[in-house]
Amino acid sequence: MSLTINALTRDDQGKGASHRLRRNHKIPAIVYGTGKAPRNITLDVFEITRLLENEESYTSVLDLIVDKKKEAVIIKDLQRHPAKNIVTHVDFLRINLKQAIVTSVPLHFNGEENNEAMRLGAILNQFVTSVEVSCLPTDLPHAIDVDISNLTMGEHISFTGLNIPKGVVITALTHGDIETHNRSVVAIQEPRKIAEIEEETSIIVEDENIESNNADKNKSNS
C-alpha cells in the first residue's frame, strides 16, 4: 500500500504568510528535484502529522498529490518547533523510480534480551543509529536490522558486517579504502568495576588538589 500526502500550490511566501498558514492548521513545504523547478506548496498539519506517525514514511516513496497531480517523492528534510515538536516545514525530493537515490536508513537493533553477555552485565554500545545508503527507490529498505543476540564480550559489528538487502549499497564503503571507512556500529564491552572507577576518580581529585596547591604557592611567592 502506497503512502499518500495531499498538497496545494502556495503563492504567498515569507514569515507573515507562514504565520497565516499555521493559524489555519496549514504548514509550508517545498518539492524539488529531477531537473524541475522547485515548487512551494501547502500541507494540512493534521494530515502530515498522521503520516509521520508511521515510521515507514521517512524511508518510503510517497505519492505527493499537488493540485490533483501525483509525483513520486521522498521526505528529504523536516523542521519542527523547538518546544512543541510540531512539524513546521517539509522538504520533498522528487525521484525517478529508475535512478538510484542516496538517503539515510535507521538501524534497528534486535536480540538484546537474548544476549548472554548482556545478561551477565556486559554493556551494549551503539555507535551508529542510521546509515547512508544508495539504491533504487523500489529497493529502499524501511530499516536495517542488526542482530546482536550472538555477539560476545569484546566483539563488534561494523558496516561490512551488516545484513544489507540486495540492491542496496552503504555509501561509506564506496569511497576508496574500505577499511578506512568501515565504522563500528555496535559493540559488547565489559563493564568497568566500581573500584576501578573510584580509583580513577580519586587520582583525578588528588591531581587537581596538587595543581591547586602549587598554584597557591606560586601566588604567595610572587
Curated annotation (Swiss-Prot):
Picking any one GO molecular function of the record gives: 5S rRNA binding
Q: Which InterPro entries match?
A: Rbsml_bL25/Gln-tRNA_synth_N, Ribosomal_bL25/Gln-tRNA_synth, Ribosomal_bL25_b-dom, Ribosomal_bL25_C, Ribosomal_bL25_long, Ribosomal_bL25_short, Ribosomal_L25_dom, Ribosomal_uL5_bac-type
Keyword Nuclease appears in the UniProt entry:
no
Alphabetically list the UniProt keywords: Ribonucleoprotein, Ribosomal protein, RNA-binding, rRNA-binding
Report one GO cellular component. Answer: cytosolic large ribosomal subunit
What's a BP term from Gene Ontology annotated to this protein?
translation
What this chain does, per the entry, is described as:
This is one of the proteins that binds to the 5S RNA in the ribosome where it forms part of the central protuberance.
PANTHER family membership: RIBOSOMAL PROTEIN L25/GLN-TRNA SYNTHETASE, ANTI-CODON-BINDING DOMAIN-CONTAINING PROTEIN, RIBOSOMAL PROTEIN L25_GLN-TRNA SYNTHETASE, ANTI-CODON-BINDING DOMAIN-CONTAINING PROTEIN
**Family as reported in the entry's similarity comment:** Belongs to the bacterial ribosomal protein bL25 family. CTC subfamily.
Subunit structure as annotated in this protein's UniProt entry: Part of the 50S ribosomal subunit; part of the 5S rRNA/L5/L18/L25 subcomplex. Contacts the 5S rRNA. Binds to the 5S rRNA independently of L5 and L18.
**What's the protein called, per UniProt?**
Large ribosomal subunit protein bL25
Which species is the source of this protein? Ruthia magnifica subsp. Calyptogena magnifica
